[in-house]
Amino acid sequence: MHPTRSFQGLILTLHNYWAEHGCAILQPYDMEVGAGTFHPATTLRSLGPKPWKAAYVQPSRRPKDGRYGENPNRLQHYYQYQVLIKPSPPNLQDLYLGSLKAIGLDPTLHDVRFVEDDWESPTLGAWGLGWECWCDGMEVSQFTYFQQVCGIECSPVAGELTYGLERLAMYVQGVDNVYDLNFNGLEGDEKVTYGDVFLQAEQEYSRYNFEMANTETLHQHFIDAERECEAILKAGSTGENSLHKCVFPAYDQCIKASHVFNLMDARGVISVTERQGYILRVRNLARQCGEAFLLTDAGGFNFKREGE
């Protein structure tokens, strides 16, 4: 299935490429997240000394970006392709360029440029040195060398690649409207477009995000998620369970709090002053989850690097 002819073909090609380069091909995380970075396979696994190589597609939700399905390239629900390699290999840029060639963008035939654009996620307490990749004047992806995640220094540094799948697919298929993307690679009566799959949902979720979401309920959901996250971490913080803190269930609650915050922001009920307060509260949850993760085997608590 050729990547220039279908959205699903593009995804399958990236899966095959990164699998051939040693990445575990994971599944999307089953939570409402604002970006692929929120997947624990990136956020948590970027911490600690243990090597990690993974790639996956992640549905991402940004309620404020909805346009009722009327904008040709702006969506409240979209897909990112995420790659995380720790420690970051010295040839990360070459690997990335190889992936572009695999999906039909030969760097020798196109104007591929890297534009410095350091990345930051305030709610995750994360930042890194990064570059946007522009192809013939349009941004198609970003790669970042993580310096800090959950407020914790990344050692070793992890390399992250993020592809905006819809934008990339529009480019390789040569269409100007995301809803016109060929989704399944077929033609005629059997052809399925991106709009066939997602347009109605985009319209309905835009209405919900901007007009219908109950703000009092959302506020309570945020409080509940915050309390539950801290309670889960506290339950495993002492005694013989000190190395088993139920980090992943706690991190789920952190993700919930972040998404609820984004919904409240879309509804316009958070002032500028309150906004910073909510961000700090989510960041505090992320920090606690990251610190707890480092006390687990997956976080490298008993891991020894070669030569130690």
UniProtKB/Swiss-Prot annotation:
One of its GO terms (molecular function) is glycine-tRNA ligase activity. Its EC number is 6.1.1.14. SUPFAM superfamilies: Class II aaRS and biotin synthetases. GO terms for biological process: glycyl-tRNA aminoacylation. GO terms for cellular component: cytosol. The keyword Cytoplasm applies. Keywords: Aminoacyl-tRNA synthetase, ATP-binding, Cytoplasm, Ligase, Nucleotide-binding, Protein biosynthesis. It catalyses: tRNA(Gly) + glycine + ATP = glycyl-tRNA(Gly) + AMP + diphosphate. NCBIfam families: glyQ (TIGR00388), PRK09348.1 (NF006827). Belongs to the class-II aminoacyl-tRNA synthetase family. This is Glycine--tRNA ligase alpha subunit. It comes from Brucella abortus (strain 2308). The lineage of its organism: Bacteria, Pseudomonadati, Pseudomonadota, Alphaproteobacteria, Hyphomicrobiales.
